[in-house]
């Protein structure tokens, strides 16, 4: 009984962590025209995982984030400023 409860708890926590990781926005460079060195590093250093292309599953995600990074006036994060944040600056 306790073993299955622990297993269910671990499963629920791992699913919630995976959901948070996949929905968290990828940070990109804030300066327009400057490359994302993390993306360049990932594309130039393929992982060696038993004969398969290790980073092939990341390619669509990285392409999608690099297309979406240009947002209003070149701001990369896409976070809308509230009036409180504007008043602080």
Curated annotation (Swiss-Prot):
Subcellular location: Secreted
Swiss-Prot/TrEMBL keywords: Cleavage on pair of basic residues, Neuropeptide, Secreted, Signal
Chief site of localization: secreted
Organism encoding this protein: Rattus norvegicus (Rat)
Protein name: Neuropeptide S
UniProt signal peptide: 1-23
Gene of this entry: Nps
Keyword Hydrolase: no
Tissue expression remark: Expressed in mammary, salivary and thyroid gland. Expressed in the brain, in a cluster of cells located between the locus coeruleus (LC) and Barrington's nucleus, as well as in few cells of the dorsomedial hypothalamic nucleus and the amygdala.
One term under GO cellular component: extracellular region
Lineage per the UniProt record: Eukaryota, Metazoa, Chordata, Craniata, Vertebrata
